Regions:
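Formylglycine-dependent sulfatase
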Residues: 10-13, 22-442, 446-476, 482-483, ...
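Bacterial N-terminal signal peptides that target proteins for export
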Residues: 1-9, 19
Length: 497
């Protein structure tokens, strides 16, 4: 499947927006695309992002060979809406997903939404996904879009929001650490039963097998969505041994704790969390090494990122005990709109076609990948819908990116103890958080106050007025989205309980 690419790209601006197109020689095949998504990986969880203990050599190497972003934002601070935004390029609320999706609920990606896979399939790509989907309420919901409907020809899907072993009799018997052989995966809608390995290796092995069995010369899109480092943590002994000094004596004596017992047990130490990151990194390495062995490294765009911020040591629920995500000093965590909940690692590599070893401080969003890839891979975006991102090709060409719209984020968390932070908007160095009543509650200059400690509400009236007006305009556009109206969706809060 060896392909070539025209290194000299000619970019033409097409209209007042940021849409650009790349002119290719007629006989040049398109590049491959691999998107690798980690689950709940924090901004400070990788050595490439400053972690002093965790070893992530494969992701570090990816950063050295590509572009690493310091101000990259996941589309949302929760799994389901973030994944919806990443794959569609649309603010998650537009897609019908405002929060994480519990099993059995009537929530799923809107049927009139189009993913990157849908669009690349139209261009003749082979498409496959391996890992966590979480864009519907389960594999049994035939009334809801499944991975096949989202454009994936081949599918190894974890049908829930996390992995578990349902062969055990009750939740109390299901191990949280050490040995979780998942039962929730399906291959092309057929249940696999209980796996004989942990989730990460199950996913990476499937990727390698799919590539080995791919016989045609078509370009491919692989969406690899690891369940690591979402709880339950499950890592082979060799990775636990790497961080033995950071695992408590009690944890070493009791490698399996059970769901009903955690709250009355001693702290297990951070080592199990560190081990799970290194285990995930090794699986990333397997995928990247395979692409290199195939001779496709120079012709493959690789994107690595996380769906949202981490669960930190400040556990809110019993199932969060003993997690140890790091934000590198950013305020907040998964499920809120502080920087720690939405600013995450992100790296893009594309051989010699984009800079190598570059670090960009330009604020970008997971919603930017769709228009960026449309330009890089020479496919058109539908004109019947609003896209919230814009191409970041200027950044990859070492030019300044002129943002046409601010970055906007939303959260609708029905189980949140204090659900006050529903919206956030970033424009340049300024970020505003708006509460559920629509009141501007916080304003920060992130260039001067990265940790969000100095609230400027009432102190910067002109900035406050300008950004709040931008928010109202943007929110109105989202609430009146044409695809939402076509589905009959209403911009109302999530109320399940």
């Amino acid at each position: 499947m060896k392909k070539t690419f025209v290194a000299g790209m000619i970019c033409l601006a097409l209209c007042a927006g940021s849409t650009l197109t790349t002119v290719y020689a007629a006989d040049v095949k398109q590049p491959n695309l691999v998107i690798i998504l980690a689950d709940d990986l924090g901004y400070g969880d990788l050595s490439a992002y400053g972690h002093q203990i965790v070893k992530t050599p494969n992701i570090d190497k990816l950063a050295q060979e590509g572009v690493r972003f310091t101000d990259y934002y996941a589309p949302a601070p929760l799994c389901s809406p973030s994944r919806a935004g990443l794959l569609t390029g649309r603010m998650p609320f537009r897609t019908g997903i405002r929060s994480w999706i519990p099993d059995g609920k009537d929530v799923a990606l809107g049927r009139n939404e189009l993913t990157i896979a849908n669009l690349l399939k139209q261009q003749g790509y082979d498409t496959a996904m391996m890992g966590k989907l979480h864009l519907n309420a389960g594999a049994g919901r035939t009334d809801q879009p499944q991975a096949k409907d989202m454009g994936f020809d081949y599918r190894l899907v974890n049908t829930a929001g996390f992995v578990t072993d349902s062969t055990l009799d009750s939740a109390k018997q299901r191990p949280r650490y050490g040995m979780v052989y998942p039962t929730g995966f399906t291959r092309n809608e057929k249940p696999l039963g209980r796996a004989n390995t942990f989730s990460g290796e199950l996913v990476s092995s499937e990727v390698l097998n799919w590539l080995d069995n791919k016989k045609d010369e078509k370009p491919f899109f692989l969406y690899v969505a690891f369940t690591e480092v979402h709880s339950p943590l499950a890592s082979p002994k060799q990775y636990l041994d790497m961080y033995s000094p950071y695992i408590s004596a009690y944890a070493k004596q009791h490698p399996d704790l059970f769901y009903g017992d955690w709250a009355d047990k001693p702290w297990r130490g951070v080592g199990e969390y560190y081990a799970n990151i290194s285990y995930m990194d090794a699986q990333v390495g397997k995928v990247l090494d395979k692409i290199k062995t195939m001779g496709e490294e120079e012709n493959t765009i690789v994107i690595f990122t996380s769906d949202n911020g981490p669960v930190t040591r400040e556990a809110r629920k019993v199932y969060e005990l003993n997690l140890a995500g790091e934000t590198d000093g950013l305020r907040g965590r998964k499920d809120n709109l502080w920087e720690g909940g939405i600013r995450v690692p992100a790296i893009i590599k594309y051989g010699n076609h984009i800079p190598q070893g570059m670090v960009s401080e330009t604020p970008i969003s997971g919603l930017d990948w769709m228009p960026t890839l449309a330009q890089m891979m020479n496919f058109s975006l539908p004109t019947d819908r609003t896209y919230d991102g814009q191409s970041i090709m200027p950044v990859l060409e070492k030019k300044e990116l002129n943002r046409l719209k601010p970055l906007i984020f939303g959260i609708d968390m029905p189980f949140q103890d204090d659900p006050t932070d529903e919206w956030a908007i970033r424009d340049g160095d300024w970020k505003m958080i708006i509460d559920r009543e629509g009141k501007a509650k916080y304003l920060y200059n992130l260039k001067q106050d990265r940790a969000e400690t100095l609230n400027q509400i009432g102190k910067q009236p002109e900035v406050e007025k300008r950004i709040y007006a931008e928010f109202l305009k943007y929110k109105n556009d989202i609430d009146n989205d044409s695809l939402m109206k076509a589905r009959g969706d209403k911009p109302t809060p999530v109320t399940w309980g």
